[in-house]
């Protein structure tokens, strides 16, 4: 009985705390990119219990052939959602987000300069940053006031397989991973013109064969956390906010004890308070949870949780109480409560999605 009671008590505690941190006026909406069915599923998240209610399914118009994944990003003012398509044609689809209902209204399809594995806006919301895995480059596209993505104003060749790109909190620097180059590109960013230029040094190296993929900035401790796809290692990197450069501090594994035939790490996210970090691995279909040391930012493994089949993408809600993971091969989403004391995941419910769900965005509106 003791082994069963623990998770139930933790769940009750997590839900009770969640109920106290969400403003009554806020509504939380979830957006799931489902590539093979060319859909974005919109759901509403109940902050009291983590339940998800379907709102609508939106088709990305003008797509003749789907491929790969559906990277998405939400503008800083929460007015627009951008979705990149990787088939035919390759576009950045802009949608206006209705603040009351969370529903999406298509604005336009803007041109992309290649197949983009990752997109993000700069901190002003005036530029779309994108990383192209097969085309080995990063790009900057202006975003018009109505949300339309304009043609690229800058295309920067990179080492092989650019995989992710993000600005730092100051919007003065941008980092981008090169999986095949085993490095993180370090750029200066002119936010007035939307121009990238090499930083000094222009890159931070990682171990050969690691395969840098996704990364996150910690909200307060001056660290960047990097997930490497090919060996499932997680790097803790000190981030110098004055210079926009990185220095390795710790390396540990996101793999469970039983190793897969093919290591294929995918995504990672921090809770908004920076207390816990999670990473998915597609070969084992697991989520690794880590506790972040409040003093020095180092990581300690919490546990591995079995999840959806081939979990390419997941997200954590703005309260930090719920984690939503999707499976490319299971065509479904599983919701979890995050124990606020331990960081352990408590499974709540599974929901059907479209075909090949692989990207999740969550936002509080208004």
Locations of the language-model features?
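Bacterial N-terminal signal peptides
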Residues: 10-20
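An edge-strand/N-cap motif at the start of beta-rich repeat modules
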Residues: 26-47
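Conserved beta-strand positions in repeat-built beta-propeller and related beta-rich domains
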Residues: 32-36, 83-87, 130-133, 168, ...
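Short glycine/acidic-enriched loop and turn motifs that connect beta-strands
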Residues: 37-39, 87-90, 134-137, 181-183, ...
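Short loop/turn segments immediately following beta-strands, especially the blade-tip
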Residues: 43-50, 95-102, 141-148, 187-196, ...
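A short beta-strand motif characteristic of beta-propeller blades
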Residues: 53-64, 105-110, 151-156, 199-205, ...
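Beta-rich, blade/repeat-based domains predominating
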Residues: 61-77, 112-127, 155-173, 205-223, ...
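Loop-centered beta-sheet repeat module
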Residues: 175-232
């Amino acid at each position: 009985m003791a082994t069963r009671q623990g998770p139930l008590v933790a769940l009750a505690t997590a839900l009770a705390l969640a109920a106290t941190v969400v403003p009554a006026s806020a509504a939380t909406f979830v957006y799931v990119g489902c590539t093979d069915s060319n859909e974005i599923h919109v759901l509403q998240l109940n902050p009291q219990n983590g339940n998800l209610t379907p709102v609508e399914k939106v088709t990305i118009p003008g797509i003749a052939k789907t491929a790969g994944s559906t990277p998405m990003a939400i503008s800083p003012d929460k007015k627009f959602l951008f979705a990149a398509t990787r088939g035919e044609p390759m576009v950045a689809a802009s949608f206006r987000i209705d603040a009351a209902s969370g529903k999406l209204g298509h604005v336009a399809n803007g041109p992309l300069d290649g197949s983009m594995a990752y997109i993000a806006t700069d901190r002003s919301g005036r530029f779309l940053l994108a990383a192209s895995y097969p085309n080995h480059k990063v790009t900057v596209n202006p975003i018009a006031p109505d949300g339309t993505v304009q043609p690229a104003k800058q295309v920067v060749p990179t080492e092989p397989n650019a995989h992710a790109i993000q600005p730092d909190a100051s919007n003065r620097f941008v980092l981008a991973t090169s999986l095949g180059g085993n490095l993180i590109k370090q750029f200066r960013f002119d936010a007035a013109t939307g121009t990238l230029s090499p930083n000094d040094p222009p890159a931070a190296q990682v171990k050969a064969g690691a395969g840098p993929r996704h990364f996150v900035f910690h909200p307060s401790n001056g660290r960047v956390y990097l997930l490497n796809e090919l060996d499932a290692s997680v790097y803790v990197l000190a981030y110098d906010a004055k210079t926009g450069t990185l220095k390795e501090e710790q390396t540990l594994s996101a793999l469970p004890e039983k190793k897969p035939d093919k290591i294929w790490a995918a995504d990672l996210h921090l809770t908004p308070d920076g207390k816990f970090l999670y990473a998915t691995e597609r070969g084992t279909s697991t989520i690794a949870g880590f506790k972040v040391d409040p003093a020095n930012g180092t990581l300690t493994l919490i546990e591995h949780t079995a999840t959806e089949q081939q979990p390419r993408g997941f997200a954590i809600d703005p309260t930090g109480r719920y984690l939503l993971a999707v499976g490319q091969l299971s065509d479904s989403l599983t919701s979890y409560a995050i124990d606020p004391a331990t960081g352990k995941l408590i499974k709540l419910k599974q929901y059907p999605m479209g075909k090949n769900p692989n990207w999740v965005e969550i936002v509080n509106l208004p």
